[in-house]
Every structure is written in C-alpha cells, then in structure tokens.
Amino acid sequence: MLYPPLNQLTSKVSSKYLIATVAAKRARELYDKPETALLEHYHSVKTVGKALEEIAAGKITPIEPELNESEFETKD
C-alpha cells in the first residue's frame, strides 16, 4: 500500500502532475540539504517519499501563478 495515499495528496494539491513536480523539486532539496526536513518522523527513507509525506501533512504547498488573459495567444 502506498503512503501517503493518493486521495490524501489530491485533497491538498489539485493535480497529480503538480504533485509530481512539487515532490520532485522538494526531494531534490531534501537530498541536497537533509537539514531542511519539515517533519520530525517520516515513514519513508527515500527523499521522494519524504516529500510526499510533507505535502500530505500540509507542510509543502505549491504556489500557482496567476495567469492574465494577455498571456495567452488566440488563433482565429
């Protein structure tokens, strides 16, 4: 069984793809700087698992940029 469960992660972050991106970036940060850990205890020993646990705990949230209509091109 996966921990944390996907439904727990998607309740915190809207997109599975965004979860993967945020987890990958955070895992790299944890690998480079293990002292930046945000939880006292992790179930996983791998950095990706630790990053997912932080997302599930609400310690990590993605910052989604606001898009303006002028940022999109329309083709007629």
Curated annotation (Swiss-Prot):
One of its GO terms (molecular function) is DNA-directed RNA polymerase activity. The keyword Transferase applies. It is an enzyme of class 2 (transferase). Pfam families: RNA_pol_Rpb6 (PF01192). The keyword Nucleotidyltransferase applies. Belongs to the RNA polymerase subunit omega family. PANTHER family: DNA-DIRECTED RNA POLYMERASE SUBUNIT OMEGA. The RNAP catalytic core consists of 2 alpha, 1 beta, 1 beta' and 1 omega subunit. When a sigma factor is associated with the core the holoenzyme is formed, which can initiate transcription. Promotes RNA polymerase assembly. Latches the N- and C-terminal regions of the beta' subunit thereby facilitating its interaction with the beta and alpha subunits. This is DNA-directed RNA polymerase subunit omega. It comes from Staphylococcus carnosus (strain TM300).
